[in-house]
């Protein structure tokens, strides 16, 4: 059995195996990988797509998802994260799926349990299953990631999605470019190219990953205005009309009119709904990888 704490823990062989299994689950919707297994889904942050897709994935693999609601737990009475983990550990669950605002919280959990731990997002650090579903969505369209030019746009500084995607897509041979307001870009990412605005590089790109503005993690005043952000870094109908080959992704939830205009959703090369569907099957494949 394996844990999935970050992208670094996955080999190229692991990634392609997960993609292949995801293809299988697109056709075969269920199996018994998790039969008689209780999987604790412990989300200390809010979520729709990730939490629900993991719950459905566990059920389709024959397991029982146990939902932990942080807002209704003893955390609201002052219990610490570690004490909560120690308490939950006593129930001998067979695996954990955890999301937490603290970076490395899944790694801390792993020191307390021998069961597989899957990181469903930890602070601004990692979100490996989001990166896997993003890469798979592109892979399913192209058949390969190798040699593709991919631009990541927006609040890179606060984005665990950006960090995981950069690491995964580079492993698969993509050339990664990043752009966003200077206040929202980290000082450096190894082997990436920074460009001034979305318009400076879009003509060379095969795909663009638009990032959500992480308002819950960022200080006020990091961008002059939402209107200016949309002008220099937003995806809009004019760009899609000019570059019809361009594939567009967004991890959701989107701030429409800022990161991407609502009109973009009508275009077949805007793959936001594909990402949501692929997210279920990727997470089934990840559970298979961790428990098989």
Give the residues covered by each predicted segment:
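Positively charged, low-complexity intrinsically disordered leader regions
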Residues: 1-52
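Phosphate-coordination loops involved in phosphoryl transfer and adenosine-cofactor binding
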Residues: 34-39, 146-150, 245
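Phosphate/diphosphate ligand-binding glycine-rich loop within oxidoreductases
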Residues: 34-136, 256
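Glycine-rich phosphate/diphosphate-binding loop of Rossmann-like nucleotide-binding domains
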Residues: 44-56, 140-211
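Short, structured coil segments at secondary-structure junctions
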Residues: 61, 112-114, 172, 189-191, ...
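Rossmann-like adenosine-cofactor binding region
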Residues: 189-263, 269
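C-terminal helix-to-coil terminal segments
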Residues: 266-292
């Amino acid at each position: 059995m394996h844990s999935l704490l970050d992208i670094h823990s996955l080999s190229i062989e692991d990634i392609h195996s997960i993609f292949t299994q995801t293809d299988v689950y697109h056709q075969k919707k269920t199996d018994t990988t998790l039969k008689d297994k209780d999987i604790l889904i412990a989300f200390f942050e809010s979520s729709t797509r990730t939490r629900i897709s993991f719950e459905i994935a566990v059920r389709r693999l024959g397991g029982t998802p146990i939902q932990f609601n942080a807002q209704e737990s003893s955390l609201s009475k002052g219990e610490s994260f570690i004490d909560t983990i120690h308490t939950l550990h006593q129930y001998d669950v067979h695996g954990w799926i955890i999301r937490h605002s603290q970076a490395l919280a899944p790694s801390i959990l792993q020191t307390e349990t021998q069961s597989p731990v899957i990181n469903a997002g930890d602070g601004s650090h990692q979100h490996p299953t989001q990166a896997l579903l993003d890469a798979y969505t592109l892979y399913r369209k192209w058949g390969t990631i190798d040699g593709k030019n991919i631009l990541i746009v927006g609040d890179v500084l606060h984005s665990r999605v950006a960090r995981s995607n950069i690491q995964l897509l580079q492993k698969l041979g993509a050339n990664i470019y990043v752009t966003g307001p200077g206040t929202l870009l980290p000082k450096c990412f190894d082997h990436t190219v920074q460009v001034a605005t979305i318009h400076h590089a879009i003509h060379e790109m095969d795909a663009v990953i638009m990032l959500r503005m992480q308002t819950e993690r960022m200080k006020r005043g990091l961008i002059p205005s939402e209107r200016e952000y949309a002008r220099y870094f937003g995806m809009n109908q004019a760009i899609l009309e000019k570059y019809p080959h361009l594939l567009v992704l967004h991890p959701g939830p989107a701030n429409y009119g800022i990161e991407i205009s609502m009109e973009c959703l009508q275009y077949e090369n805007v793959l936001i709904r594909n990402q949501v569907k692929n997210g279920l099957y990727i997470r089934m494949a990840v559970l298979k990888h961790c428990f098989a």
